């Protein structure tokens, strides 16, 4: 399932966990990263085999944590925080603006596969609210105008 480099990373990771099932969360992160930001049925089965646990157990863990995705995200995955600190300074309005601008709702990906939007409860950037994450990059004090510029910049980088 993994490339040669990914397999080496997997082996390094497993060497830190004498009990294989304890590596479940890091393995899910690795599998998701190596699979373009989401967990396929194949990757879930592979992780279950490595950890020597059932696929049902792995699926239960995936459903508990919001950071694991079962659908392929857009090339640019916009995670918009709507926790109280962000909402107090425009987080909900920013989410609505972004949905309107891209013509998609939170939890979905545009037909062209370029953007996906996810509403987040908290991304740990309360001091810089409203905040968003694009893929793995944080953007702080985002407003509708700066979101429009960000979307334009990303759109010009297909």
Regions found by a protein language model. Give the residues of each.
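Signature of N-terminal electron-transfer/Fe-S-associated modules in redox systems
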Residues: 1-158
